[in-house]
Amino acid sequence: MSHSDFNMEPEYVSFSDKDTKSILNESKSSLKDVKPSLEEKSYITPGLVDDVEPKGKNFVVRFFDDFKPAKATGEDGTALKRSLKSRHMQMISIGGAIGTGLYVGSGSSLADGGPASVIINYSLIGIMMFFIVYALGEMAVAYPVAGGFNTYATRFIDPAWGFAVSWNYFINYFVTFPLELTTCAITFRYWTDINSAAWISIFLVVIIIVNLFGVRAYGEVEFILSTVKVVATFGFIILAIIINCGGVPTDHRGYIGGSIIKHKPFRHGFKGFCSVFTTAAFSFSGTEVIGLAAAEVDNPQKALPHAVKQVFWRIAIFYVVSLILIGLLISPDDPNLMGNGSTSVSPFVLAIKEANIKGLPSVFNAVIIISVVSVTNSSTYTAGRTLHGMANLKQAPSFFKYTDRLGRPLLAMIVVLLFGFFAYINEADKNGNDVSDTVFNWLLALSGLSNFFTWGSICLCHIIFRLAFKKQGHSLKELGFVSPMGIWGSCIGLFFNILCLMAQFYVSLFPIGGKPNANDFFQGYLAAPVTLAFFIGYKIYDRSHIPSLDKLDITTGLKTYENLDEEEDEPTTASKRIFKKISSVFC
């Protein structure tokens, strides 16, 4: 090649206006061809369903199109939409279990065991839940899958145990839905004697409408209801302090201080203490729902840890502080207290009434109704998602896997909503019969211990997961969220659940104020043999076995987050490191 070849003038290609227009038209045409493929890719985003609504269709057509099956699934094999935001999860975690267990159930606890038993036992169960929720949060961030903790039990413990626990958990919330509808109607009797069926119909329609709008509607409704409960409980705490100090002009008792709690701190001895221990555990039912919702949370690695850390404040403020104040204001011998007589009133409402504050008891009764509606809403969500998760694990009929274009597990949801009509059995009581109470008591007895089985399984799953994770050479740095209590926290949580089962057995066998009898025992402990029957039956059918730690599948669906904190500046002093560690647990 000669030197002159490097000095050649560059050649330019010229285009006419006609050629330019032709090229632009071809480019536009090729971009149109690319657009559908980009939309198709959005369908395979893990856990997401396409949000693009079809153009040119009216509302009615789109409404019916939404019921058609989802076009594609996420990598966990489901088509649930990740529509829950961090704010939803935080309010669900704070207000999720602030409901009838606190506002109503604490009354029977106070009557059975006295104020000291209430404060001690609710604090102990709160510590147990603290360990359980952190263990659940770690696994939910690592495996944000449909079915949540029920799926973990199948995977890490044994498929037969997962089957038994999942069905027990489903039955619990399946029955709770119509029961809470009935409770809504009964609560209105504080103001009016309107037929209960009318209130049941109103609330049933409301719950159906909420579920028609999918998981986002559930999240928004729970956000609003939980906000009301949180504000109301804060308001009660402030008011209760004022009442105790004698600051209410209409309260002629003056300064109360600790005079009531000193009079009779305990009731019914050890039996009363055990009774409150189990009642307190039931009051925290629903705390674990944040783990079940992991498959529908947008960015679970950020949303779930924040929600988990709120549990400490909910336990410390809303349960312990409010119940200490209830113990200071209400005598366990009060005949109006739930558990002491035929006329039963919530201890929160009773504390306000005894201070002779006009109008405010009705306001707090409205808060109790809101809390019952919240529990009803959560029950439909929990039961439907649990049934859908079991279908994905082949532990329930496969048609319950059906998910529509809005990410709703449609058939599972319909079955749960239809069972809500069972609440009308309350009408059978008009002739003086207690048909509804008898039926609901025995239906609840089938799954009465589901909380203990579920929480214990979460702890055991976390222990096995951690051991297998270490055995197979993985580092905790790979996880997006790590429980600061580790395996030992889960061991303590598991131990507490075993204690709860023992206490429930004792109280069922030797009921307060009565002699041992078959009716009381099986209403309190029937769930144990039922769960065992589920376990043995599935074990015979599936012949499943428990894999060893080194062969346990912990990689499928595992979300790892290596080098997650590399950009964060490490504290330079020991005091700052301690402060960071403490704040990371609670904030």
UniProtKB/Swiss-Prot annotation:
InterPro entries on file: AA-permease/SLC12A_dom, Amino_acid_permease_CS, APC_YAT
Gene Ontology biological-process annotations: amino acid transmembrane transport; L-arginine import across plasma membrane; L-lysine import across plasma membrane
Cellular component terms (Gene Ontology): cell division site; medial membrane band; membrane; plasma membrane; plasma membrane of cell tip
TM spans (from-to): 91-111, 116-136, 159-179, 194-214, 223-243, 273-293, 311-331, 355-375, 406-426, 445-465, 492-512, 521-541
Domain of life: Eukaryota
Residue numbers carrying Phosphoserine: 29-30, 37
Keyword terms of this UniProt record: Amino-acid transport, Cell membrane, Membrane, Phosphoprotein, Transmembrane, Transmembrane helix, Transport
First-listed, main subcellular location of the protein, grouped into a coarse class: membrane
Extracellular topological domain: 112-115, 180-193, 244-272, 332-354, 427-444, 513-520
Record localization: Cell membrane; Cell tip
Effect of gene knockout: Leads to a dramatic decrease in the uptake of arginine or lysine and resistance to canavanine and thialysine.
Cytoplasmic side of membrane: 1-90, 137-158, 215-222, 294-310, 376-405, 466-491, 542-580
Mode of membrane association: Multi-pass membrane protein
PROSITE patterns noted in UniProt: AMINO_ACID_PERMEASE_1
Molecular functions per Gene Ontology: amino acid transmembrane transporter activity; L-arginine transmembrane transporter activity; L-lysine transmembrane transporter activity
Protein family according to the UniProt entry: Belongs to the amino acid-polyamine-organocation (APC) superfamily.
Role: Major permease specifically involved in arginine and lysine uptake.
Name this polypeptide is given: Cationic amino acid transporter 1
Gene: cat1
